[in-house]
Amino acid sequence: LISLFQEKMGEFVETIRQKTAGIESAVSKLFMLVETHFLLLSQNDPLAIVTQLELRQSNQDLRLKINEVLKGYLQVMDEILETGIKQGEFQADLNVRVARQMIFGTVDEVVTNWVMSDHKYDLVALSKTVHGLLIAACGYRQ
């Protein structure tokens, strides 16, 4: 289970990096991250179920392994947030660690609710709304 998660998460991080490579704006990069997260899981139901339900284990060893696998994804979020701060898109005193936790937690919870509702709605269609909430929380003002 962990090796499958590790492989898929590695592919996922690489996909995010490729899709955001030519984008200057942190706000646009964050949209790409959210949309890609939702798109990839909506296209792979078994992976969505595994990531949202099966990997929610209380076993400490398993949790540590999962956290290790997630580091690359969380690093991408940190890079986007730091870019946004440097470019003045996000508030200068933004706590990157807390903002990352907020982004990851929000995206994760939206996918979990989608899985638990038996996919009754279009997950990818929520990208714009979720992104808008996240950038507002990071201090973005148009």
Feature-to-residue mapping (PLM):
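C-terminal peripheral helix-coil segments that are non-catalytic and often amphipathic
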Residues: 32, 36-43, 75, 79-87, ...
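An amphipathic alpha-helix adjacent to DNA-recognition modules
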Residues: 1-17, 31-35, 74
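Short secondary-structure transition hinges
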Residues: 39-78
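Solvent-exposed, amphipathic alpha-helical segments
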Residues: 11, 15-19, 106-113
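Hydrophobic alpha-helical connector segments
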Residues: 14-46, 99-103, 127
